[in-house]
Structures are given as structure tokens and as C-alpha cells.
């Protein structure tokens, strides 16, 4: 599985035994990121069976509102497939808190997906 780059955004995927980490870096400003992210997320789902997964947004500089729907869809799929997932964000960055507190509210009753400030 490869990392992904698009218009200033880099998603770095690393896999170590039973742990997979997807690190978000840079700026997500694509006008239709779902066109690129949805197929990429589908590929990631294929390798996550019986593994722990972390999506780390702490190094993301900015994210436009168009990026949120594909992330939410992916989170829902992770929960449905029972993939133990941690979503981490930098709570010292106001825009990240503003984006991820609502996501943590949406996922509060999820059993497999947890949103964690760092």
C-alpha cells in the first residue's frame, strides 16, 4: 500500500506487524477530495483486517470543509467492519478542535472508533 499526495496534502501510510498508521500532513484544499480519497480509503480497508489502525491528523496544517465528508464515510466503514481505530488530532490547534470535536460527538457511541485529542 502506498502513500498518497495531492495538491499539498500528503497521507503517509506505515504498517508495522499488527499496526497501521495513516499520517496526514500539509494542507487539504482539493475542491473534490472524495474523488481521490474514497478509492484510497477502500484500498486501506482491504489491509486492515485484524489490525489496529491510527489516523493521525496532528501534522495537518489546514483542511477545507470538502475533506470532512469522505473522512466521515471512512470512519463509518471502519466502525461497520469492526476495525479498532484511533483518530488523533492536535487539540492545541483551534481549527482542529473545531473540526474533530463534532466528529467525536458523531462517534461517541461507536465501539471500534475513538477520537482522541493529543
Give each language-model segment a name.
Residues 64:
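Short conserved active-site loop signatures built around small residues
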Residues 1-61, 73-118:
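STAS-like cytosolic regulatory interaction modules
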Amino acid at each position: 500500500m502506498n502513500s498518497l499526495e495531492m495538491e499539498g496534502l500528503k497521507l503517509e501510510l506505515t504498517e508495522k506487524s499488527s499496526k497501521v498508521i495513516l499520517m496526514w500532513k500539509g494542507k487539504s484544499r482539493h475542491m473534490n477530495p472524495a474523488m481521490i480519497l474514497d478509492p484510497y480509503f477502500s484500498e486501506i480497508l482491504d489491509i486492515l483486517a485484524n489490525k489496529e489502525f491510527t489516523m493521525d491528523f496532528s501534522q495537518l496544517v489546514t483542511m477545507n470543509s470538502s475533506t470532512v465528508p469522505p473522512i466521515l464515510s471512512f470512519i463509518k466503514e471502519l466502525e461497520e467492519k469492526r476495525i479498532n481505530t484511533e483518530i488523533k488530532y492536535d487539540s492545541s490547534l483551534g481549527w482542529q478542535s473545531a473540526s474533530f470535536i463534532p466528529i467525536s460527538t458523531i462517534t461517541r457511541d461507536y465501539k471500534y472508533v475513538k477520537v482522541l485529542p493529543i
